[in-house]
């Protein structure tokens, strides 16, 4: 930039600064006043940077003028301009013993020229301060990324190449976030600071600043959104309402946020990668030739025999596989293989036992198959046996006299059926279940004690569940109207506790009936 442009910029910035100062004197709202104070500070810094750039340009112009004057003066005095005569004079002075003084003068002149060249380079680099660029950033895992940044200063030249220090505008990691105390020279941690003190990069590595275009953002678009910690995280836009964007972050640890337009940008990293859309739009067809193609005629392709859509499982993933295949020339909807008649379903994954050989895995698979077949046959046999028993019970009929009834109730299962009647115990009851039922009905001491313990445990469970229901009810009343998710969770737990209470009360009633039944039998049998 020339002097005129810089002076005009300084004049414009000064006028804007005066307008801001007059607006501050007018007495506005505290919120507006804070914004104006921030704007005033930014304008002051911008004026200082522009003035520094103007001084650098003036220095460069003056140095160039001085060099021209030195050249004209040397021509006027007859001093040779080429280096050959200087060498001859140096040889002559060496012969007469004055070579030391002349060589020192030559070295001084060369040092002065180098200092002037370095000053010009530093002046050009200083003029870049405050410029927005795209700078490289090397992550801890070794990848190279380009992010929007701003030049904040210069560094010592390395390998005859200028270096600058940049601060990233949209930090995506804590190590990229500018240290709030670095610009004020108040940071006490130096290189051990967890925040960024600027990244030193070569000037040749800088790229043009990429402005964020919010017009392409819509619901479902990927984006970068700023969190309260000042770091920009990747996510997707779920809703747009009057320049307010609702963003769902990719990380499950971050909650959905609603940000304004200055808190969301498109994912700028994707533009760094070579896009295949540019090659597809090429009129010369070079993009299509860049990918290997197998089919050249439409009739060579036949529809796939499978009814499932290719890549249907990627509805649950990010779909990186299909994207890579499309970049390699795959045409969507066609099968794999030379004639595009291959499979489109994924190969099912079979998890084999750990530490087993393939022979053992095959044997285990065969055993599972045999068990399934045998289980099916056993099920058919069991159902056939059930039908046979039901038919036999229907043909024999039930008990016909009062003696069979008394024998069955009082536990005389070993009595001869022919002595007391034609019917024994029903075939559906096993002897063990009959003995337990008769023992419970007779009300023996051990059985009575077990019934009492069972009744006590049932009562304790009911009391504990009632206390839990009371606690959940109190907690729900306290949280009503605060946290909807917690209220829903408490309501679910309360409903489950009430269902459990109904079951436990039913068990308690059953235990009470058994206990009363044993007491009744004891009273009827003891005279």
Curated annotation (Swiss-Prot):
Segments for region (Disordered): 97-126, 268-312, 369-396, 410-444, 505-527
Cross-referenced Pfam families: G-patch, zf-CCCH_4
Record's compositionally biased regions (Acidic residues): 111-125
A GO BP entry: negative regulation of epidermal growth factor-activated receptor activity
UniProt KW Metal-binding keyword: yes
Domain of life: Eukaryota
Basic residues biased stretches: 384-393
Domain G-patch positions: 317-363
Keywords: DNA-binding, Metal-binding, Nucleus, Repressor, Transcription, Transcription regulation, Zinc, Zinc-finger
InterPro entries reported in the protein's UniProt record: G_patch_dom (IPR000467), Znf-CCCH_4 (IPR041367), Znf_CCCH (IPR000571)
Subcellular location: Nucleus
GO cellular component: nucleus
Compositionally biased intervals (Basic and acidic residues): 511-527
GO molecular function: DNA-binding transcription factor activity; DNA-binding transcription repressor activity, RNA polymerase II-specific; RNA polymerase II cis-regulatory region sequence-specific DNA binding; sequence-specific DNA binding; zinc ion binding
Zinc fingers, C3H1-type class: 173-200
Known role: Transcription repressor that specifically binds the 5'-GGAG[GA]A[GA]A-3' consensus sequence. Represses transcription by recruiting the chromatin multiprotein complex NuRD to target promoters. Negatively regulates expression of EGFR, a gene involved in cell proliferation, survival and migration.
Protein known as: Zinc finger CCCH-type with G patch domain-containing protein
Species: Salmo salar
Gene: zgpat
